[in-house]
UniProtKB/Swiss-Prot annotation:
PROSITE patterns from the UniProt entry: ATP_P_PHORIBOSYLTR
Family: Belongs to the ATP phosphoribosyltransferase family. Short subfamily.
Protein name, as recorded: ATP phosphoribosyltransferase
SUPFAM superfamilies reported in the protein's UniProt record: Periplasmic binding protein-like II (SSF53850)
TM region(s), chain numbering: none
Reaction it catalyzes: 1-(5-phospho-beta-D-ribosyl)-ATP + diphosphate = 5-phospho-alpha-D-ribose 1-diphosphate + ATP
Organism: Brucella ovis (strain ATCC 25840 / 63/290 / NCTC 10512)
UniProt-listed HAMAP family: HisG_Short
Gene designation: hisG
Amino acid sequence: MSVTLALPSKGRLKEKTLAVLEKAGYKVVLPDDDRNYRARVEGEDDLDILFLSASEIARELGYGSVDLGVTGEDLVRETLAHADERVAIEAQLGFGHADVVVAVPEVWRDVTTMADLDDVAADFRQRHGRRLRIATKYWRLTQQFFSQKHGIQVYRIVESLGATEGAPAAGSADMIVDITSTGSTLRANRLKVLEDGIIRRSQACLVSARRSHTSRRVEEIAARIRAGLEI
């Protein structure tokens, strides 16, 4: 029975993932046609490669339709409810580092912590006649962090379909929850990260579907990739 390994379909994530696999002894033979999203591995007839977007990989792992995948831990936690029951993080791969953060306008000088933000949220409706609006693509992580961890209840999530960091300046939101690696884009949009506003530190990970844990082949592949990281 073959094992399906889902990999990022483009960009630096794809390049770095292929390098990690080659270091572990898995040389991926790319298709001649860029529109072909399947590939093979030299000498591994029972290992199928499937190229997907990072968010699709997280979803398919949750469904159990792929056995292993490389994606960001932020996407795993955001995409899958009860993620630990459905998937397992096999290895952190050491690239694709980014943080999911709470960021507010720099002009909110008195707001530096989540406790300050709680006060703002409680006061916002009385002052403005509406709830505090948070633009984000990470609604699950936002709800968990605001409501469950910090007890902040009076806010409204605004789905971000474009560049989240531009939402406050555009007037479609008051603040944001977004992913950042250097913080330069946030600073360019005059936003600041709250002192205790890091929701999750993320990086590219090798992830397995729980339903595949009975497969010795899946365990073998994961172990070989982990060993390759230590070379």
